[in-house]
Each structure stands twice: as C-alpha cells, then as structure tokens.
Amino acid sequence: MSLNPPIFLKRSEENSSKFVETKQSQTTSIASEDPLQNLCLASQEVLQKAQQSGRSKCLKCGGSRMFYCYTCYVPVENVPIEQIPLVKLPLKIDIIKHPNETDGKSTAIHAKLLAPEFVNIYTYPCIPEYEEKDHEVALIFPGPQSISIKDISFHLQKRIQNNVRGKNDDPDKPSFKRKRTEEQEFCDLNDSKCKGTTLKKIIFIDSTWNQTNKIFTDERLQGLLQVELKTRKTCFWRHQKGKPDTFLSTIEAIYYFLVDYHTDILKEKYRGQYDNLLFFYSFMYQLIKNAKCSGDKETGKLTH
C-alpha cells in the first residue's frame, strides 16, 4: 500500500538529520555476539515511547496493534510516520507470502514499511509474471541449484546469450544467414547489453520453512536464477527447530542480500545504507532478548 510522495520526501529529509551512526564497521557487526548492535540506525526513541504506551489504533482499519498495522502496512497512531526512516534500495523487491503465514509474525512487513516504493507483497497464489524477464530477476532461496551473489552477473549474461540464440533459431532462415546474424547479435551483446546488464528485481518467499515448498515449486517460479545466502546466520527469535541457522527470516534475508550485493556486485564500500531495514527488527530483537534475560513471561506480547 503506497504512501504519498511528499511524505516520502519529508520522512527522508527529517530522518537524515536524526541519523545516528553507532558503528561503521559492518564486518565487526557480523562477527560480534550481537550482530545487530553496530548498525547505523535512525533514532528508535519513537518505538521506545510506543512500547511504553502500549498498543495503538491503526488509522486505516481501526485495529489495535503494536508499532504498525500488519494488514494495512502503516505505522499506528502513536508512531508518527515522519519519525520512521525511509530506505532507498538499489533493486525492486517482490515478496510472495504464504496464505497461512501469520501476518503479525511476519517480518516481510518491515520491508514494505521502510522501503514502500521498492517493495511489493503478494499473497500466494498471486504471483507476478517473470518468464519474459528471467534475465533480470533472481529468486533468493537455498537449494542445490542456487548460486552465490558474486556469480549473479555471469549467470544473467548467460541467460541473455541463450535468449539471443533462441531468437535466431529460425528454421526458415538459411543457415549461413542465421550464423551471421547470431555473430552480429553476440558482437552487439558484448559491446552494449552485457556492459549494461544488471539485476533489477529480487524475489523472496515469506513463509515458515515447512510451508515454502508449495510456493517454491510453483511453475511460475521455475527456471528463475536461484541465489543463496550461505554465510549469514539468523538471530530471529522464532527460529524453527531442525533448521540450520543459515535459514534467515525474511527481513534478514533482504538486508544481508543487499549488503552483499552492494559490495560484491556494485563494488562499493558499505556504509550502512540499508541498516534501517532492521529498524523494527533490531528493536524487537532487543526487547525480547531483555525480556528473556529477566524471565518476563509477557515476552510474546511485546510484538503482535
């Protein structure tokens, strides 16, 4: 659900002045016991106040929620929207949500709240058409066919080359003409297309790991380039038993993918540009961590 552009600008300008840089070293952050403690985040004072005052009303549907409405994708009444950071992303993101996924437990909503112009959420079986754009789209999901982020550009270029071959495979065209046309196409490809080839959209499945198979095996997602985050570990408080700690929550997967994409594909130094994607997540993580340490039985009520 989109918000008006003027609000985007206002949020971006106001939060730039409130930006709080706690640490600049992403490597140190990942290596530490608490991987979220060194993030460059906007002030979370608004969340602290909201947590103290308790649930508030969604101005759209009237529902009682903590921090934000997970059905309307907007902050609640006691969390002013201008105090929520706005994150600019280098890619568009589609999230395919399992219909049985509990909205209040999903972290996918965080991405929509914090980067609304770049993120779309679809509820399965609703899936966009990707077949004609498989050379610029990747599905972020582990599996035997998955590749690492650093190999994305190579594999997308191979797809473009395969598409060129397919277009020139005309049985009615003399073979020598087909060969010449193909050579010319590859020449053009090397001169222009490959240089400008970039990933434009990434897809995530939002579901418990036990329910992902239904979406993952859907024919509309078959054949897409599959990418796995193999070195990151989750700190999600709802970690599922029997699953490796490299199986991330949705917002963790989005965040870590973008950090690695920034350094491995864009070849730029990461300076916390996407850390605010964990604005809600890191706050909830700390709340629950503190509650567990104090033996608070109300831990489950701290989040939806």
Swiss-Prot record:
Motif (DXTW): 206-209
Key words of the record: Acetylation, Nucleus, S-adenosyl-L-methionine, Transferase, tRNA processing
Sites bearing N-acetylserine, chain numbering: S2
One cellular-component annotation, GO: nucleus
Record-linked InterPro entries: DTW (IPR005636), tRNA_Mod/Golgi_Maint (IPR051521)
A Gene Ontology BP annotation from the UniProt entry: tRNA modification
Catalytic activity: a uridine in tRNA + S-adenosyl-L-methionine = a 3-[(3S)-3-amino-3-carboxypropyl]uridine in tRNA + S-methyl-5'-thioadenosine + H(+)
Molecular-function GO terms, alphabetical: tRNA-uridine aminocarboxypropyltransferase activity
Main subcellular location of this protein, as a coarse class: nucleus
Pfam families: DTW
Top EC group: transferase
Catalytic activity, EC: 2.5.1.25
Subcellular location: Nucleus
Family: Belongs to the TDD superfamily. DTWD1 family.
Role summary: Catalyzes the formation of 3-(3-amino-3-carboxypropyl)uridine (acp3U) at position 20 in the D-loop of several cytoplasmic tRNAs (acp3U(20)).
Protein's name according to its UniProt entry: tRNA-uridine aminocarboxypropyltransferase 1
Gene responsible for this protein: DTWD1
